[in-house]
């Protein structure tokens, strides 16, 4: 499945919630009818079956983290093999992706922009260039901006945006050095209550 390149707001309207794909902090403009699905008959959202509800939740999480369908299924399989709660394991695996960590640290204003920074070799992990967005960041890994990329306007703009949102407790950032430490994997209580990972587990357990 190819990566979606169309309007970002359309995805948020499809899921009925702001996925923060367009901006890292600014809520969707009030003119955007977030409660209406895209399309001519978007105002008439049909009642979903149990399967439909589960599918929409999976799509919401997958699109939030910018992961393709095959990747997402592989993350679920890995989460199911790990000890503990499968749903929580899944969210932790997604949070540990390098592109997501770059976003959480405020070096990219969106996950998509953060993914691009990684792909363009602007990111170091423990002093080594890593250009794989799905790279699994471990506790105490140091993530930083490569020296020749530090003056990029988009990074400066992202840092400005980041000052308007609360820094997650599981990362520590030194903006003067443009580097941060991934202290630990987040606990479930650290993450959005708008995500119902149990629905995703039910979907894949069928």
Curated annotation (Swiss-Prot):
InterPro entries referenced in this protein's UniProt entry, alphabetically: Ribosomal_uS4 (IPR022801), Ribosomal_uS4_bac-type (IPR005709), Ribosomal_uS4_CS (IPR018079), Ribosomal_uS4_N (IPR001912), S4_RNA-bd (IPR002942), S4_RNA-bd_sf (IPR036986)
Gene3D superfamilies: Ribosomal Protein S4 Delta 41, Chain A, domain 1, RNA-binding S4 domain
Presence of the UniProt keyword Isomerase in the record: no
GO molecular function: rRNA binding; structural constituent of ribosome
SUPFAM superfamilies assigned: Alpha-L RNA-binding motif
Entry keyword annotation includes rRNA-binding: yes
One Gene Ontology CC term in the entry: small ribosomal subunit
UniProt keywords, alphabetically: Ribonucleoprotein, Ribosomal protein, RNA-binding, rRNA-binding
GO biological process: ribosomal small subunit biogenesis; translation
S4 RNA-binding domain residues: 96-156
Subunit relationships: Part of the 30S ribosomal subunit. Contacts protein S5. The interaction surface between S4 and S5 is involved in control of translational fidelity.
Alphabetized HAMAP family for the sequence: Ribosomal_uS4_B
Function: One of the primary rRNA binding proteins, it binds directly to 16S rRNA where it nucleates assembly of the body of the 30S subunit.
Family statement drawn from the similarity comment of this UniProt entry: Belongs to the universal ribosomal protein uS4 family.
Entry protein name: Small ribosomal subunit protein uS4
Taxonomic lineage: Bacteria, Pseudomonadati, Pseudomonadota, Gammaproteobacteria, Vibrionales
Gene this protein is translated from: rpsD
